[in-house]
Amino acid sequence: MSQDLRSYLDKVRAERPEEFLTVSREVDPAYEITASIVKLEKEAKRRPVMLFEKVKGTDFPVMSNLHASRPRLAMALGCNPRDMQKTFLAAMENPIAPKEVNNGLCKDVVLKGAAVDMRALPQVVHLGGDGGPYIT
């Protein structure tokens, strides 16, 4: 089972490279990201993990479709797709306690106080009926 997002993405890239798509050109978070995902699904019948590296207005990338297929979700859970329900229920019945660490990958970038600016995060508008941009 993948222990974190990075190891999961590395596993998808290595074992299912056709299911990982990197978009290197700049995209607009207002409608364009969602339009790209929908177009790929409708025209090519594909739902790969999508990494948008350059998102207008932010220094952060955007990822989508992380678990958009049963086989990828099963990969993340470390099981066969037909065993997903059993694996998930077993995990819920036997939870693993969180482990606090002083350093680690989750602490690569630490912002505190005035350095924290939520407006720096990508704010996506998915559809015309959205109330505006939001963080997902």
Across the structure, where does each feature detected by a protein language model lie?
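Extended, highly charged
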Residues: 1-136
